[in-house]
Every structure is written in C-alpha cells, then in structure tokens.
UniProtKB/Swiss-Prot annotation:
Polar residues composition bias: residue spans: 99-113, 141-150
Start and end residues of each stretch annotated as Disordered: 99-184, 209-247, 295-316
Localization (cell): Membrane
Topological region Extracellular: 20-47
Entry-linked InterPro entries: CXorf66
Keywords: Glycoprotein, Membrane, Signal, Transmembrane, Transmembrane helix
Membrane topology field: Single-pass type I membrane protein
Amino acid composition bias (Low complexity), ranges on this chain: 114-133, 299-308
Name of this protein: Uncharacterized protein CXorf66
Stretches assigned to the Cytoplasmic side: 69-361
Length: 361
C-alpha cells in the first residue's frame, strides 16, 4: 500500500513540474491574462484529483485495519470462552470426584449397608438348613469390623457404587423368592411322604409312591373306590427327580417321627384300608364291568346281609328288570363261601347299582 501511494505522489509531482514549465514558455509568447486563467483551472483540477485519490487511499486503509482488528478480537473472544469452559469442566470434575470420595469415606454408609443386609436376612426366615444357620452366625461377626478398612476397600472400588447396590438388592430378592418356593415345595413333599408312610404302615402290600399333583375328584366321591395297583421294589427305590440338598434336614426330621405319632395320624387311613381290603375282589370285578359297559357308573362296595336289604334288593330288581340286558349282569364266586353266589346288575338308565345274594341249594 505504501508503494502505491508513493507512485501516485511521484506521478502528481511530475505533472506539476511539466505544467509549470509549459506555463513559463507560453507566458513569453501569448497574452498573459488568458493563459493565467487556464493555468489556474488546470492546477485546481489536478489538486482535486490528488485530494480525491488520497481520500480514497485513506478510506481503504481504515477499512482494512478495522476488519483486521475485528477478526483478531473475535478470535481472542472465542479462545477466552473455550478456556473458561475448560476451566469450568475441570472444576466440576474435581468437585464431583471430591463429593464421591467424601460420600464413600463417610461413616454413615456403613450402618446403611448393615441395615440393608439385616433386612434381606429377615425377609427370608423360612430357611431350615444347617448352612443357613451358620451363615447367619458368621454375618454379624463380619459386620463388627472397624469402619476404617471398609472405607479403604470402598475407595478401591470403581466409580459406580449405585449400580452395584441395585444389582445386589435384585440378587437378594431373587434368592429370597427362590427359597420361599423351595420351602413350599418341600412342605408339599413332606405331607405326601407322611401319607405314604402311613399307608405303608397300615398295609402289607406295596403302595404307589406319592406324586405332587392334584387328583381329579369325580362328582360322587363317596360311591367310588379306586383299587391301588402294586409296584415293584425297583420303582419304590427310585430317588426323586429333583433333589435339593436344602430339604435334606426337613426330610430327615420327617423320617425321624415316632411310631406313636405315625399311629395317631394313620388311624383314618387304617379304617379306609380295612373297608377296602374286605371288598377288594368285589371292587375289582365291578371295575371290569364298568369298563365293558360304561365309565360313569358308581359302584357300592358294601353288601348288607340282613333280611331288609334282601327285600329292598328284590323290589329294585323287579322294578328295574325291564331296563337290564344279559350283558349287564355278572356273577362273582367268592373264595371263602363256595355256597354263595353274588349277582350284580347295573342299570344304565338310572345310573344305579343293585346286588343280590342267593344261596345254592
């Protein structure tokens, strides 16, 4: 820019010198007043041009300086903002880390953790094994340690204590629910095994082992007796499918019950077994007849030997004789009394069963 200005100034100075020389030569030849007016006008024009050029150059220079200064100021302000943001981020990080260390080192977190452990232990009081009792004895002794090594151990942990506490709480809740389910299953199995032990004590023949499912009861449970099928010693000796070591203590206690308690609990089963045992062959034959004819017939397992029962049965036979076919009757010869014949007739239309006892002469 300075070079351009110098060149313009030199050109203007040369023109001025040339004009002065021409004016000196012409003054000697022509009229003086006319030449003097023309020279003055030319001189003014040149001076005006020089002033306009100088003004333009100064304006351009000022604009350039202004733009350059604005750009530098914008860059400086941006750099200052970035520095301020970096300083604020560093200060926030340091304050957050200090707060974490203070919260970890504070002794208030120790009783909170101990209360959480105690609540999780109290939420599962149904544990009935030796291992759980030993763990409960060990836990309070471990909680009585000083808080200084605990705080030092917490400082070595990663910077995400909240997530670990949430995961530990979820694990404890899942363990407690699992233990409650296992205790319920163990109580059901205990009841089934008590029934099975009572049946074994009351009967001479092997009995079906207990199963954990609800039996399907019919609409007339009093008139229905299902014969028990014998099982071999191999099937009785099979262990359960799902073995749980936590139930071993409860099952051992159930197995160590005294004979007197078993006898007291098995009295109703003995009565039922005696009734079913006296009429077992009769019930087996009735079940075969039911399979041949229909499955919805209800069979009575007792036959009265009094004269009134004979009269009632004769009247029923006379009343329902029209509805009975030859295929609906069945004869049973008992092993004890060879002179007695038991005839059982099944009525399909009325869903009733009548029986007769006649003597062979």
């Amino acid at each position: 820019m300075n070079l351009v200005i110098c060149v313009l100034l030199l050109s203007i100075w040369k023109n001025n010198c040339m004009t002065t020389n021409q004016t000196n030569g012409s003054s000697t030849t022509g009229d003086k007043p006319v030449e003097s007016m023309q020279t003055k006008l030319n001189y003014l024009r040149r001076n005006l041009l020089i002033l306009v050029g100088i003004i333009i150059m100064v304006f351009v220079f000022i604009c350039f300086c202004y733009l350059h200064y604005n750009c530098l100021s914008d860059d400086a302000s941006k750099a200052g903002m970035v520095k301020k943001k970096g300083i604020a981020a560093k200060s926030s990080k340091t304050s957050f880390s200090e707060a974490k260390t203070a919260s970890q080192c504070s002794p208030e977190t120790q009783p909170m953790l101990s209360t959480a452990d105690k609540s999780s232990d109290s939420s599962s009081p149904e544990r009935a094994s030796a291992q759980s009792s030993t763990e409960k004895l060990i836990r309070p002794s471990s909680l009585q340690k000083p808080s200084i090594p605990n705080s030092a151990g917490k400082l070595t942990r990663p910077s995400y204590p909240k997530r670990s506490s949430k995961s530990s709480c979820s694990k404890k809740l899942s363990k407690s629910s699992h233990l409650e389910k296992a205790h319920k299953k163990g109580s059901l199995e205990k009841l089934c095994k008590l029934d099975y032990a009572c049946k074994l004590a009351s009967s001479d023949k092997p009995v079906r082992p207990p199963q954990l499912f609800k039996p399907l009861y019919s609409s007339h449970p009093q008139n229905e007796i299902s014969p028990s099928k014998p099982f071999g010693p191999q099937e009785l000796a099979k262990p359960p499918k799902h073995f749980n070591p936590k139930r071993s203590v409860s099952l051992g206690r159930a197995a160590l019950l005294s004979n007197s308690e078993l006898a007291e609990t098995c009295q109703p089963y003995k009565k039922k077994h005696l009734v079913a045992k006296t009429y077992r062959p009769l019930v087996n034959d009735i079940s075969e007849a039911k399979e041949k004819n229909t499955q919805n017939l209800h069979v009575s397992s007792k036959v009265k030997s009094s004269s009134r029962s004979f009269r009632k049965l004769d009247s029923r036979n006379n009343a329902y004789g029209d509805h009975v076919n030859d295929s609906d009757t069945m004869k049973y010869y008992s092993e004890v009394d060879s002179d007695k014949v038991i005839i059982i007739t099944c009525d399909r239309g009325y869903n009733q069963v009548t029986s007769e006892v006649t003597l062979n002469d």
